[in-house]
Structures are given as C-alpha cells and as structure tokens.
Regions:
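Short beta-strand "acidic-cap" motif of Rossmann-like dinucleotide-binding folds
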Residues: 29-31, 148
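Active-site-lining helix/loop region of Rossmann-like oxidoreductase modules
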Residues: 9, 13-14, 128, 137, ...
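N-terminal Rossmann NAD(P)H-binding glycine-rich loop of SDR-like oxidoreductase domains
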Residues: 2-27
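Structural motif
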Residues: 3, 71-72, 100
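NAD(P)H-binding glycine-rich loop region in Rossmannoid oxidoreductase-like domains
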Residues: 12, 37-95, 188
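Residues in the short beta-alpha loop(s) of Rossmann-like NAD(P)-binding domains
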Residues: 10, 35, 107
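Short, polar loop motifs at secondary-structure junctions
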Residues: 33-38, 152
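Glycine-/Pro-rich loop/turn segments that contact NAD(P) or position catalytic residues
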Residues: 78-163
C-alpha cells in the first residue's frame, strides 16, 4: 500500500480526517507535525512523526526520505507561511524523487480569484493569495498533482454529495469529511494529470 506523507494533519481539520481514513485502512503514514502534543498522539496511533515546521527543509527532507520515493504527498496546510512551507515541501519532494501530490487550498485561489467577493477578499484575501502562490509553485514543478479548492468548510459527517467542479464559477460549502473522502479517491487514482478542482456540495448550508 502506497505510503502517505501528510502535512497539516496535526489539528482537527481536513488533514486530521484524511489521517483517519489512512489509519482505518492501515496505510503507512509519515507526517510532519509542528506541535509536540499532536505529534505524540499521532505517534501513538502508529504514524511515523517528524516534529517540526514545514518551512524547515531539514525536517521536510527527513520526512521525504522516510516516506520513500513512492510516497504520495497530501498537504492541507495553511497559515501565514503557507507559500514558503509549500515551496519547501515541493522542492524537497523533487529532490527525494517523490512524484505525486495533492494540495488543498480554497475557493478564490488562482483563476477563481475574480469570483471572490470584495468582502471575502478583505476578510481573508491575504491567505488566499498565499495559497495561490503555493498552487503556482506546484503547477510549475515536476510533480504530478491535483489541487482541491473546497468551499466553506463545515464539520458535519460525510454525505457523499460533494462535487468536483472545473472551469466554472461556483460558491458554496462542503463538509471537511467529504473533502477527505475526495482526497482519498484522488490518491488512489492511477494518475492525477495536473488537474485543479473546486469542491462544494451544492445544496449544503451551515446549520
């Protein structure tokens, strides 16, 4: 079974739900975790953990070596250093011979920026721009990739109704568990083919 190398799985978001799917099928998992308490918890679950920041090339390189060249990278990271962290991950992946990666960003990134409202741009536009830079670095790398741009994230159970949409404006919400399910599906596909998807559940509304 192909090992997964996870970035951003230390909290309670999409990354954590993706990790749950991997552990449920006893998949080998390597993860870079920033916080020691989360690292300890995951190590107890059987994850091979590297504690440190994804901006630290030495930590990322060690994780890439441990995962091996056949590993599949999945990143759900965010934060103020989003671009620099992903640049480090992508660069070290190339050096290690890892060739496949799924990057989770958000609606509004890249060519979907014009569809973001002015209110949204004012509220979290800086984060979206960071994510856009990360997308660009991946798209100009040697990796086979898929980029998932989920809509507003909710905490409900997976419904199986989320849709991947390409080349059109879309708005909406999606459950974190459904994002993880789509990550799992893509990670098991024969190839990713450098695709970018928006991901929403059309009729889903916040409770």
């Amino acid at each position: 079974m192909t090992p997964w190398l996870l970035f951003g799985a230390g909290g309670k978001g999409v990354g954590a739900r993706t990790l749950e799917l991997a552990l449920a099928e006893q998949r080998p998992v390597v993860a870079v975790i920033r916080h020691a308490d989360a690292a300890t918890k995951q190590a107890q679950q059987g994850v091979q953990v590297f504690t440190g920041d994804a901006c630290d090339a030495s930590v990322v390189a060690a994780a890439c070596r441990a995962a091996g060249p056949d590993a599949f990278i999945i990143s759900t990271m965010g934060g103020a250093q989003d671009y620099l962290a992903h640049r480090t991950v992508i660069d070290e992946a190339e050096k290690a011979g890892i060739s496949r990666m799924i990057l989770v960003t958000s609606l509004g990134c890249g060519d979907s920026w014009p569809f973001l409202s002015e209110r949204a741009k004012a509220a979290f536009g800086q984060a979206v721009r960071e994510k856009t830079l990360a997308e660009s670095w991946l798209q100009t790398s040697q990796l086979d990739y898929a980029i998932l741009r989920p809509g507003g994230l909710l905490d409900g159970a997976a419904t199986g109704k989320a849709q991947r949409i390409q080349n059109q404006e879309c708005h909406g919400f999606v459950n974190r568990a459904d994002v993880a399910a789509h990550i799992h599906e893509l990670a098991n596909a024969p190839a990713l083919n450098q695709q970018v998807y928006s991901l929403i559940e059309p009729d889903l509304k916040p409770a």
